[in-house]
Amino acid sequence: MGLVVMFIASWLAIFIFYSFQERLTILENAFVFLVSLTLVINASWIIAEELKLVELTKDGVAYTGFILNRSVGVPMIFVIAMNAVFRAKRVWTALASVAVVLAALVGLNGLGVYFEIAKYEKWNLGYDAISYAALLAIVYGLLRLYRKTVYRRTPS
C-alpha cells in the first residue's frame, strides 16, 4: 500500500507542476530539480544509512515507494515550492507557500511511517520539518546564486 500512496503522491506532484503557471524558466526548473534531487538523496542516505536514525523497510515493494518518493516526489515538490516562492509578490505569501510545502513533505513522511516504509529510531516528524526547511533554504540560495550568475550582464 505504501508504494501506491507514494506513486499517487509523486504523480500528483508532477500533475500540479504541469498545471501550475510556472514562474521559473525550464532551465531553472531543471536546476532546482537536480539540486534538490542530489541534496535529498544525500540527506536521506546520511540520516538512514550512516547515522542510523531511521530504519528503512526491507520489503522490496515498500522500499520502491520510498525510492519513488525520494527521487521524484520530493524534488518535484521542491520545484513547485520554488515556483511559488518566486511568484509571490509578498513575503508572507512566500512563507505561506513554504509552510504548505513543509506540511505536505512532513505528511508524506508521516504516511511513510504509517505504511511502515520507514521506522523512526532516533528521529521524528519535527526533525523532518527542520531538515526539509534547511534543504529548501539551501535550494533557494543556490537558485538565487544561479539566477545572479546566469542573468549577469556582460560588459560590452
Predicted features, each with a name:
Residues 1-156:
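Aromatic-rich, lipid-facing transmembrane alpha helices and their immediate juxtamembrane interface loops
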